[in-house]
Amino acid sequence: MTISAQVIDTIVEWIDDNLNQPLRIDDIARHAGYSKWHLQRLFMQYKGESLGRYVRERKLKLAARDLLDTDQKVYDICLKYGFDSQQTFTRIFTRTFNLPPGAYRKEKHGRTH
């Protein structure tokens, strides 16, 4: 494994451990000790997706799980994963899952209960 691949694996682990934080690309790059441009190029090279997309999709998957597994309010889940606002969270969630968070919870609960 190359040093660059090890760096990306370490960063992925750190990201996964800190998904409840805002996690701006600048912050991730600073943690890695790379410029954001270089880190984004490395990430794309080794993971095949952008760093921003990886962080967003990981947060959304965890939020979707929380919608199904907890009774937490959508607003609380939005804050838990560091989204700037419930409006932003709802827009991105809806784009990803084709349903707003509340409807996603109702539809998926209807299928499992």
Swiss-Prot record:
Domain HTH araC/xylS-type: 9-107
GO cellular component: cytosol
Pfam families: HTH_18
One of the GO BP terms on file: regulation of DNA-templated transcription
UniProt keywords, alphabetically: DNA-binding, Repressor, Transcription, Transcription regulation, Virulence
Cited InterPro entries: Homeodomain-like_sf, HTH_AraC, HTH_AraC-typ_CS, MarA-like, Tscrpt_reg_AraC-type_HTH
Induction comment: Chlorpromazine activates expression. Indole activates expression.
SUPFAM superfamilies named among the record's database cross-references: Homeodomain-like
The keyword Transcription regulation is assigned to this record: yes
Sequence intervals crossing the membrane: none
DNA-binding region, residue range(s): 26-47, 74-97
GO molecular function, one term: sequence-specific DNA binding
Domain of life: Bacteria
Null mutant phenotype: Deletion reduces transcription of various genes, including acrB, porins ompC and ompX, and some pathogenicity island genes including invF, sipC, sopB and ssrA, in the SL1344 strain. Reduces growth in the presence of various phenothiazines, including amitriptyline, chlorpromazine, sanguinarine, and thioridazine. Intolerance of hexane. No significant effect on adherence of mutant SL1344 strain to mouse-derived macrophages.
Something else known: Overexpression of ramA in the SL1344 strain confers multidrug resistance and also tolerance of both hexane and cyclohexane.
Protein purpose: Transcriptional regulator. Binds to regulatory regions of target genes, including efflux pump operon acrAB and outer membrane protein gene tolC. Represses transcription of genes belonging to the flagellar regulon, including flhD, flhB and fliC; probably thereby leading to repression of motility. Represses expression of the flhDC operon in a post-transcriptional manner. Activates expression of acrAB, perhaps thereby conferring multidrug resistance. Involved in indole- and bile-mediated regulation of acrAB; binding of bile to RamA may contribute to activation of expression of acrAB.
Name the record gives this protein: Transcriptional regulator RamA
Organism the protein comes from: Salmonella typhimurium (strain LT2 / SGSC1412 / ATCC 700720)
Lineage start: Bacteria, Pseudomonadati, Pseudomonadota, Gammaproteobacteria, Enterobacterales
Gene that produces this protein: ramA
